[in-house]
């Protein structure tokens, strides 16, 4: 990136960097780096490397996005997880099976070239 003159990076991190939070809702001010699994630790370490890069070289622009897996619906029931057709996310899929709308949960793919045979994509390449 440096050789190409690209000093902007948006990092796809995770809310797992918060570990098991002591307060809800989680805010930017909550303690971080108290991870409970290796995935969270790797995201936290990558965040730290990018923060140090930006401190050492202020011409770098770093944005950290900490994704959550939101589940649920608004108390009015007017917005929430109720996909049309076959859902793409696990929880609405399980909810449709539990309600009888679908017969069973299907698991697709067991032949990915990873240790646990799941598809893992950590980086987004933009051309």
Segments predicted by a language model, with ranges:
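Conserved NAD(P)H cofactor-binding loop of Rossmann-fold oxidoreductase domains
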Residues: 13-14
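Catalytic helix-loop patch of NAD(P)-dependent Rossmann-fold dehydrogenases
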Residues: 3, 7-8, 17-69, 78-89
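NAD(P)-dependent short-chain dehydrogenase/reductase
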Residues: 51-127
């Amino acid at each position: 990136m440096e050789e190409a003159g690209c000093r902007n990076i948006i990092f796809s991190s995770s809310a797992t960097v918060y570990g098991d939070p002591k307060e809800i809702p989680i805010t930017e001010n909550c303690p971080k780096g108290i991870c409970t699994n290796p995935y969270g630790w790797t995201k936290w370490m990558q965040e730290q490397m990018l923060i140090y890069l930006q401190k050492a070289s202020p011409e770098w622009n770093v944005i950290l996005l900490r994704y959550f897996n939101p589940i649920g619906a608004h108390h009015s029931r007017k917005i929430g997880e109720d996909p049309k057709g076959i859902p793409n996310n696990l929880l609405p899929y399980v909810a449709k099976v539990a309600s009888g709308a679908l017969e069973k949960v299907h698991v697709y793919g067991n032949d990915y070239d990873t240790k646990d045979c799941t598809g893992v994509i950590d980086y987004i390449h933009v051309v």
